[in-house]
């Protein structure tokens, strides 16, 4: 499912990307690099609604909006979530049901809520 919710929304999907039912909610840019794999029910969301007490009645309540960028050859396992402002480096893996709240360096495996690095991927493994 692709949802664009703002005039600044833009979704860019690279070459040879495998999409297995992700949800992309964009009020800013979402960019997915070449050769990525997105598992089932992966969610990308470039904005968060305010936690302000009158958010349901105040249309001007602040909303955090930031782009998301996924590098090349990244695998996002099923049911993970990528939150506003995150950049995931090339050749990384995001584990099942991980919640990615901050940037992920290239060549690592992250898992958990919030996602954290659990292992580095060797140069040899990245390109085999």
Predicted regions and their residues:
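Flexible, glycine/small-residue-enriched loop-and-beta-strand segment within the central core
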Residues: 1-86, 121-128
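C-terminal/domain-terminus segments
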Residues: 87-111, 115
